[in-house]
Amino acid sequence: ETGGRVEVLESDDKNAAYTGPLTILVDRFSASASEIFAAAMQDYGRGLVIGQQTYGKGSVQNLYPLDRYALGQDPGYGQLTVTIGMYYRVTGDSTQNRGVMPDLTLPSAISTDEVGESSRDGSLPWNRIRSSDFRREGAFTPLLPELQQEHDARIAGDPDFQFAVSEISALEKMRTEKSVSLNLAKRKAEREARAQEQLARENARRQTLGEPVLKAATEIKDPPDAILGEAAEITADLSQLEPKFLARASGTDKGT
């Protein structure tokens, strides 16, 4: 807090609500409370964080109505937002500015250069304090190479996922454009060219799936959420690998 006091937040309930395989899907818009949860699951080895680097909102604010201190019936001065504290992980690291880094990375259309605390001028820097005394419930590090291998093999043959990647690449290309033509005919031609490129990507996806191709870009509908689908596949992989790893670690694996 602002006075330098460290308050450790604890739970009186020592029982686990769920003990099965757990993944936490995050992206650059995951901020504040969702970052605290993801970081806690990661630090305790309780859950696998997948997706994109999170927002990096690790500060605590309070609102102070300025009208309370003003004279007059209806001054209308608004309110002041004051930072009064910071959140820290049990490791002592802050989530401020850096956010939470995923254990397995998935592509995202959200630019980390444009969204997040680190992209804002004057944002509070990352820092750390002394670690808390805590006990890890598990460790996913030994499973990551096999999970990554399964993920890479699966997405290589997933038309929906590859379509999502191509859409993200097209969006990133548009972000790099530093000028816009003021000529109306040229602008329309550029827009039509992008529509045709999107139609080509969609039809490539459809052909791979054995679906009929479309004739116009206006016929394109939102495809399945490939990122969410792959997150579910990774969770399924984890549910298969985690018991085997625990059995090997405890010496109870009989090779079956």
Language model: regions and residue ranges:
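C-terminal "post-core" interaction segments
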Residues: 1-256
